[in-house]
């Protein structure tokens, strides 16, 4: 994937130079792109997702829970949630509005707040409509401690975008609408969604429904896979 991205960046630079008259041709276009092999990222199991939420609720007086829930139930990227402020979250309209300077792609995105997420965000109370960051001070360290204490993914380590992958996989499993999911994820085409984000291994219609309806139910009530 790094070779693929490297060629793409180089081609963009050469195209810019070509338009400015700094070179005669884009030599990168003469080289076929290397085959892109996407690494399959396993979505969290239902038990793991709930275990992570409950750990976030239990530690640091629950101040990390909203950010955790936004990544898990709205597919907000880690980079985006660090910049997100409470006044970008509108529980009345049911939308999280991400500004262009906060997103990975540089475009604005509006993500639906589903009931399971709304129930968690409502607990923030007085924080609504404020310009304060959703993530508390010293977020990175606290988030690492929460992941460590949750006990999930110990063997293979934490994957940066695993909550976004989990969101996408459970969303499609339960709602079955690829076009809607593509819009929520902010993808221009379905190709990235289908080739990189979706991993339905171990996800059933039952666990898909439970993911979206059993927000803070104790993980002990669920079967650990």
Regions found by a protein language model. Name each.
Residues 3-9, 19, 23-78, 82, ...:
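Basic, Lys/Arg- and aromatic-enriched nucleic-acid-binding interface segment
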Residues 4, 11, 82, 169, ...:
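Key DNA-contacting residues within the recognition helix of helix-turn-helix
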Residues 11-14, 18, 201, 205:
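C-terminal flanking helix
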Residues 51-59, 90-137, 149, 204:
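Basic, alpha-helical nucleic-acid-contacting "clamp/cap" segments
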Residues 54-64, 74, 111, 125-133, ...:
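Short, basic (Lys/Arg/His-rich) helix/loop patches that form interaction surfaces
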Residues 88-95, 157, 176-196, 218-225:
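Short, polar N-cap/turn motifs at the start of nucleic acid-interacting alpha helices
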Residues 98, 102-106, 118, 185-210:
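Catalytic-site neighborhood detector that most strongly recognizes the C-terminal catalytic loop/helix
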Residues 126-129, 209-225:
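C-terminal secondary-structure termini that scaffold catalytic or DNA-interacting sites
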């Amino acid at each position: 994937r790094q070779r693929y991205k490297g060629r793409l960046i180089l081609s963009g630079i050469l195209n810019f130079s070509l338009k400015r008259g700094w070179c005669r041709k884009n030599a990168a276009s003469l080289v076929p792109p290397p085959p892109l092999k996407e690494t399959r990222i396993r979505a969290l199991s239902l038990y793991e997702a709930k275990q992570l939420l409950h750990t976030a609720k239990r530690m640091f007086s629950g101040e990390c829970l909203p950010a955790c829930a936004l990544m898990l139930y709205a597919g907000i990227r880690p980079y985006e949630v660090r910049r997100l402020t409470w006044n970008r979250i509108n529980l009345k309209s049911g939308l999280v509005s991400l500004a262009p300077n906060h997103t990975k792609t540089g475009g604005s995105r509006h993500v639906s707040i589903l009931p399971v997420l709304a129930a968690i965000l409502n607990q923030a109370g007085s924080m609504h409509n404020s310009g304060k960051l959703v993530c508390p001070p010293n977020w990175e360290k606290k988030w690492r401690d929460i992941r460590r204490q949750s006990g999930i993914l110990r063997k293979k380590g934490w994957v940066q975008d695993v909550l976004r992958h989990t969101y996408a996989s459970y969303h499609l499993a339960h709602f079955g609408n690829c076009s809607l999911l593509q819009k929520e994820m902010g993808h221009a085409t379905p190709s990235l969604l289908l080739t990189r984000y979706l991993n339905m291994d171990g996800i059933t219609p039952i666990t898909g429904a439970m993911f979206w309806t059993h927000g803070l139910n104790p993980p002990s009530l669920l079967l650990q896979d």
